[in-house]
């Protein structure tokens, strides 16, 4: 079962190319600070602007750098089922422990189309699959009843839920067996989802504060709700600041302020405004991440 504090890791760039040394350093930073798993090539990893070759390479680098210390769940989604199959097959052959597959975007399939998309993937590659529901980006919502159907497929093992609806998340948990991992796709909903029976989070804030998100999840699992609530409250201002502009622009700016990477993003994403940067910087100073 995939659970705990899992990071949706950024893809660092330098002079327009993947910065492999920086990516390897980020992975060490994550593992040293208690992260339970790493997701390369997700939304936060700018998968949409990676070439096919770069996408494959980022996954390979991550698997090599992690060295089986924590699970690697590779982002392999596409709005083409055939392309998602290719990406998923590569991740499996490269040694990924699982794949995160965003719902097909732009073409807006029906619920039956979504079911058949994931079913075809599951039948084509023998790897644990986590569908990713984020209607605000994809234009389609994987409904709880569809998730319940998917959960009956043996290698569809969980879902990253970013619908923004706790009611929907609760319905998914209610309709699926306890072994099905419902993971928050929104840092703010991590603690509320855990209280409903969720298993963890695929996190953006973990890029900059991995120990704190790991602490929240560990405290909850240990039954220390007071500590879990304190960590939640501590992180809320930073979560807000990391979404002051389109993800992953702010989190890359934050990592740059911490001296870990260049803040380069690829067009059509663009660097932060100075107003947003100053707001982010103040929050990070108050949080203790920078001086």
Curated annotation (Swiss-Prot):
Its EC number is 4.3.3.7. Keywords: Amino-acid biosynthesis, Cytoplasm, Diaminopimelate biosynthesis, Lyase, Lysine biosynthesis, Schiff base. SMART domains: DHDPS (SM01130). GO terms for cellular component: cytosol. CDD domains: DHDPS (cd00950). PROSITE patterns: DHDPS_1, DHDPS_2. The record marks 43, 106 as: Part of a proton relay during catalysis. Pyruvate binds at residues 44, 202. GO terms for molecular function: 4-hydroxy-tetrahydrodipicolinate synthase activity. It catalyses: L-aspartate 4-semialdehyde + pyruvate = (2S,4S)-4-hydroxy-2,3,4,5-tetrahydrodipicolinate + H2O + H(+). InterPro entries: Aldolase_TIM (IPR013785), DapA (IPR005263), DapA-like (IPR002220), Schiff_base-form_aldolases_AS (IPR020625), Schiff_base-form_aldolases_CS (IPR020624). The keyword Glycoprotein does not apply. The active site is at residues 132, 160. Pathway: Amino-acid biosynthesis; L-lysine biosynthesis via DAP pathway; (S)-tetrahydrodipicolinate from L-aspartate: step 3/4. It is found in: Cytoplasm. GO terms for biological process: diaminopimelate biosynthetic process; lysine biosynthetic process via diaminopimelate. Homotetramer; dimer of dimers. Catalyzes the condensation of (S)-aspartate-beta-semialdehyde [(S)-ASA] and pyruvate to 4-hydroxy-tetrahydrodipicolinate (HTPA). Belongs to the DapA family. This is 4-hydroxy-tetrahydrodipicolinate synthase.
């Amino acid at each position: 079962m995939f659970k705990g504090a899992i990071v949706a890791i950024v893809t660092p760039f330098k002079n327009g190319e993947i910065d492999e040394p920086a990516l390897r350093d980020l992975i060490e930073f994550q593992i040293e600070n208690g992260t339970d798993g790493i997701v390369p090539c997700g939304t936060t990893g700018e998968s949409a602007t990676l070439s096919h070759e770069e996408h494959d390479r980022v996954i390979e680098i991550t698997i090599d750098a992690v060295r089986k210390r924590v699970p690697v769940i590779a982002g392999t989604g596409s709005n083409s089922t055939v392309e998602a199959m290719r990406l998923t097959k590569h991740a499996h052959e490269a040694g990924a422990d699982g794949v995160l597959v965003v719902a097909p975007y732009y073409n807006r399939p029906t619920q039956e189309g979504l079911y058949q998309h994931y079913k075809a993937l599951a039948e084509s590659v023998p790897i644990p699959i986590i569908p990713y529901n984020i209607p605000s980006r994809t234009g389609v919502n994987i409904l709880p009843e569809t998730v319940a159907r998917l959960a009956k497929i043996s290698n569809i093992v969980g879902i990253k839920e970013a619908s923004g609806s706790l009611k929907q998340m609760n319905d998914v948990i209610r309709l699926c067996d306890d072994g099905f991992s419902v993971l928050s796709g929104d840092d703010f909903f991590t603690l509320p989802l855990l209280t409903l029976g969720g298993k963890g989070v695929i996190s953006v804030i973990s890029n900059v504060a991995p120990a704190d998100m790991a602490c929240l999840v560990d405290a909850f699992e240990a039954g220390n709700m007071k500590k879990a609530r304190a960590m939640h409250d501590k992180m809320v201002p930073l979560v807000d600041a990391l979404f002051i502009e389109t993800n992953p622009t702010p989190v890359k700016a934050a990592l740059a302020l911490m001296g870990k990477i260049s803040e380069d993003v690829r067009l059509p994403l663009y660097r932060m405004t100075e107003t947003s940067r100053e707001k982010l910087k103040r929050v990070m100073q108050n949080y203790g991440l920078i001086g």
